[in-house]
Amino acid sequence: MKIRIMVFLASLLCTIGGHTHVIVGFSPEGSAQKLVMNTLNSAHHAINLMGYSFTSPEVVKALITAKRRGVDVRVVLDSKANQGRASVAAINLLVNAGIEVRTVDKNKIMHDKVAIIDDVTVQTGSFNYTRAAQRSNSENVVVMWQMPEVAQVYLEHWQSRWSQGQAWQSRY
């Protein structure tokens, strides 16, 4: 009940007469994962995603589905956090579907969890793109819909990490 109230209150942050709004979600209650999926599935022309740990089959499927419908999907991930079997398998699926993936090892960790959608919407928060974030961890997601000025700032940050990254080579 508290989660529904918080999501409702966050949705009230709408600009009168406009489409700009902010929505929040939480896990493990389930609203974080739903919000991430809705945001990714809303993309029409671009998804620029950056993450720390990456193992979520649902996110992999959403990104591949977006790519197949013509969305330009690019992903930049922390190098050290994605050496396990589940991460390697998830990233290989993306690359084998034609999605560009780069990994970054310039910082101690690249702890960003961000998706920039169509250069106007930003999804961010503590939520890693993992099953643990969905099912076990206490996490949060914030989506800022139709906020191109905010999206531009995040896109510049995303681009700085993308330019530091090394292209992922599929291991199968």
PLM region descriptions:
Residues 13-19:
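N-terminal signal peptide c-region/cleavage motif recognized by signal peptidases
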Residues 53-57, 79-83, 107-110, 121-122, ...:
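Solvent-exposed loop/turn segments at secondary-structure junctions
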Residues 31-35, 58-59, 110:
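Short acidic active-site motifs
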Residues 117, 121-172:
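Signature of lipid phosphatidyltransferase scaffolds
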Residues 23-25, 48-51, 74-77, 102-103, ...:
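Structural recognition of the beta-strand scaffold that forms the well-ordered cores
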Residues 38-99:
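Primarily the HKD phosphodiesterase
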Residues 20-44:
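Short N-terminal segments immediately surrounding and downstream of signal-peptide cleavage
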Residues 2-9:
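Sec-dependent signal peptide recognition
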